[in-house]
A protein has these predicted regions:
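C-terminal reverse transcriptase regions that engage the nucleic-acid substrate
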Residues: 1-41, 173, 181-183
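Conserved pre-motif C helix in the palm subdomain of viral-like polymerases
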Residues: 1-8, 60-69, 93-110
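Conserved active-site beta-strand-loop modules that form the wall/rim of enzyme catalytic pockets
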Residues: 6, 40-42, 52-54, 69-71, ...
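RNase H-like nuclease module associated with reverse transcription
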Residues: 16, 52, 84-202
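Active-site-proximal structural scaffolding
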Residues: 24, 36, 65, 104-107, ...
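Structured nucleic-acid-interacting core domains from mobile-element enzymes and related host factors
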Residues: 33-59, 120-122
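Conserved helix-loop functional segments at active or binding sites
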Residues: 37-41, 62, 78-80, 110, ...
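RNase H-like nuclease fold core
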Residues: 55-94
Length: 202
């Protein structure tokens, strides 16, 4: 998949590949029409040596399995992303966001090791940006884990990475959360604005 702007749509459609209905076919046609109308778009790399490995992660809380999305940048260039359903049931939006941060952290670990193998020097914590202050607090506060025993392993995994300064979880206002387009069907205005903020397409 080479278009981050259709990642959420493609992920949702893939869930119904074994038993698609008329509504899914109609949605797939809309995606194809969008791709036709934006065929000239491409990923643009504008390296910024000041920026290291950073990621943006968001989750949309659902009554059962939430959807998480993440974007990963190196030197300010988008090179990897995901949009997928969580495998664990979370009991609040904060837990869903925290679990999304854990998924992003797993990707970051793999990416860091890959970059090191390629000869890059990674000597600073990789930043994971999340739009939930509660989720950020859970990554630093041991007391918070008493309320999250059902996702204890994920909590311990992420907190260990934070303690070892492998990753750093930071809050980012929802209005500028780029990963929002990977977790829900945004309105046209919001979608267009986030794509502009992404500053990756040309």
């Amino acid at each position: 998949m080479t278009r981050v702007d259709i990642a959420y749509s493609a992920s949702q459609l893939a869930r119904f590949m074994t038993n698609p209905g008329p509504s899914h076919f109609k949605a797939a046609i809309r995606v194809l029409v969008y791709l036709r109308d934006t065929a000239a778009r491409a990923l643009v790399m504008r390296p910024d040596p000041v920026r290291g490995l950073e990621s943006f992660v968001d989750s949309s809380w659902a009554t059962k399995f939430s959807c998480s999305g993440g974007m990963f940048f190196y030197y300010g260039c988008l090179f990897h992303w995901f949009s997928k359903m969580q495998r664990s049931v979370t009991l609040s939006s904060a837990e869903a966001e925290f679990f999304g941060a854990m998924l992003a952290a797993k990707e970051v670990i793999f990416i860091r090791e890959l970059l090191i193998d390629l000869g890059f020097i990674i000597d600073a914590a990789s930043v994971i940006k999340c739009d939930s202050k509660s989720a950020v607090g859970m990554a630093f506060d041991p007391v918070a884990f008493k309320k999250t025993k059902h996702i204890l392993r994920a909590a311990e995994f992420l907190r260990d990475l934070v303690a070892r300064e492998v990753v750093s979880v930071e809050h980012l206002p929802g209005a500028v959360m780029l990963a929002d387009i990977l977790t829900k069907a945004a309105s046209r205005a919001v979608f267009v604005e986030l794509i502009k903020q992404l500053d990756t397409f040309a």
